[in-house]
Amino acid sequence: MKKDIHPEYRPVVFMDTTTGYQFLSGSTKRSNETVEFEGETYPLIRVEISSDSHPFYTGRQKFTQADGRVDRFNKKYGLK
């Protein structure tokens, strides 16, 4: 490998902003925020969706998609 061209791979804490769930993983992503996790200080990366809040992993289905073309067509012609 060439020197000084690869990003630094280090442990970071990812935090699900929806649920507050935190987990430690390796990443090259940079952050100015830090958090104490299991007695150590790590960079903090905030994510909107993780395995703790995603409907596929939680088993809870919720529809957040806005009306699409098919829905508008069905409403316009009273098909549903």
From Swiss-Prot:
Signal peptide: none
Keywords: Ribonucleoprotein, Ribosomal protein
GO biological process, one term: translation
GO cellular component, one term: ribosome
A Pfam family of this chain: Ribosomal_L31
Gene Ontology terms for molecular function: structural constituent of ribosome
Assembly, per entry: Part of the 50S ribosomal subunit.
Protein family according to the UniProt entry: Belongs to the bacterial ribosomal protein bL31 family. Type B subfamily.
Protein name per its UniProtKB record: Large ribosomal subunit protein bL31B
Organism the protein comes from: Streptococcus pneumoniae serotype 4 (strain ATCC BAA-334 / TIGR4)
